[in-house]
């Protein structure tokens, strides 16, 4: 039985899942909008939102935790210098998941994942 087991396996090993969501979170913070499948988008929320919450309080320990989870100095800088300040007054719900139809080929449900209150002006195609 699967009672009280949280998270989706997504037909991957645990190390593959961890690496995939780490890379997806870095891409999300870099571009502020990514397109992925709906189940991956829902799981990405569990990885990305705690990182933004961590970035709201700037400390060396929090920066080290963020680097451990993203492995990117540039993204850690953006998290603490831009995103942490942008969402300082927001209590949560930093991501928006928008369904965008089905993928050609396997008919998988697709979704855009974007940061709420992101500056508008970039094209959607650039993030894909």
UniProtKB/Swiss-Prot annotation:
Q: Which keywords does this chain's UniProt record carry?
A: Ribonucleoprotein, Ribosomal protein
Query: Which SUPFAM superfamilies does this UniProt record tie to the protein?
Result: Prokaryotic ribosomal protein L17
Return the InterPro entries for the record: Ribosomal_bL17, Ribosomal_bL17_CS, Ribosomal_bL17_sf
Q: Does the keyword Ribosomal protein apply?
A: yes
What GO molecular function annotations does the UniProt record carry, in alphabetical order? Answer: structural constituent of ribosome
Top-rank taxon: Bacteria
**Biological processes, Gene Ontology terms:** translation
| Gene3D superfamilies, A to Z | Ribosomal protein L17 (3.90.1030.10)
A GO term from the CC aspect: cytosolic large ribosomal subunit
Q: Which Pfam families match?
A: Ribosomal_L17
Q: What does the record note on quaternary structure?
A: Part of the 50S ribosomal subunit. Contacts protein L32.
Matching entries from HAMAP family are given as: Ribosomal_bL17
Similarity section = Belongs to the bacterial ribosomal protein bL17 family.
Could you tell me which NCBIfam families the record lists for this protein? L17
Q: What is this protein called?
A: Large ribosomal subunit protein bL17
Q: Which organism is it from?
A: Pseudomonas syringae pv. tomato (strain ATCC BAA-871 / DC3000)
Q: Gene name on record? A: rplQ
